[in-house]
Regions:
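Short, Lys/Arg-enriched N-terminal segment that forms or immediately precedes the first helix
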Residues: 1-12
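Short helix-coil-helix linker/hinge
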Residues: 15-17
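Pre-recognition alpha-helix immediately N-terminal to the DNA-recognition helix
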Residues: 20-25
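Short capping segments at the starts of secondary-structure elements
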Residues: 29-34
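DNA-recognition alpha helix
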Residues: 37-46
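Basic amphipathic alpha-helical segments that dock to polyanions
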Residues: 54-64
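Non-DNA-binding regulatory cores of transcription-related proteins
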Residues: 63-141
C-alpha cells in the first residue's frame, strides 16, 4: 500500500508535516470528510494547524489529482482519498457519505472510449442509509 508521502511525491507535491498528515488522514478515513472535520480531528495532533492550511492543502491535492473533491452535498465539499473507480451514496437524512462499489461491467465501460483518458467519474446515489431507513420504519409503526 502506498504511503501518504509516496502518494504526495507521485502526484508532484512536496511533502510537509501538514500535507502528509492530511493525506494520511484521507487514506485512513473513508468517511469523505469536510475541511472542518479534518481540521477538528488533526488539531490535537498538530496544534499549529489552521483551517486555512487544511483548505489550501486540500485545494493543492485536488489540483494535482491526489484527492477528489465531491460536490455531492449542497452544503459542504467532501474529500475522497480513494481514487479507484467507485460511486458514492449520500443519506438525505443524516448526511453520511459512503462508497459504493461499481460492477466490473461499468468499470470496463469507463475505459472503452477510444482516444480519451477518463480521469474521474462521479456517480452519486441519494436516499436513506440503513440506520436512517430503520428509524423511519420505526417511526411509522
Amino acid at each position: 500500500m502506498e504511503t501518504a508521502v509516496q502518494h504526495l511525491i507521485n502526484h508532484g507535491i512536496r511533502p510537509s508535516v501538514q500535507r502528509v498528515a492530511i493525506m494520511h488522514y484521507l487514506m485512513e478515513h473513508f468517511t469523505h470528510p469536510t475541511v472542518d472535520t479534518i481540521y477538528r480531528d488533526l488539531l490535537p495532533e498538530i496544534p499549529t494547524l489552521s483551517r486555512t492550511t487544511v483548505y489550501n492543502t486540500l485545494q493543492l491535492l485536488q489540483e494535482h489529482n491526489a484527492v477528489w473533491a465531491l460536490s455531492i452535498d449542497k452544503r459542504n465539499v467532501h474529500y475522497d482519498g480513494n481514487l479507484k473507480p467507485h460511486a458514492h451514496f449520500l443519506c438525505r437524512e443524516c448526511g453520511q457519505v459512503f462508497d459504493i462499489e461499481i460492477d466490473d461491467h461499468l468499470k470496463s465501460h469507463l475505459h472503452s472510449y477510444p482516444g480519451v483518458k477518463v480521469e474521474k467519474v462521479e456517480l452519486n446515489y441519494f436516499g436513506l442509509c440503513p440506520n436512517c431507513k430503520a428509524k423511519q420504519v420505526e417511526s411509522q409503526n
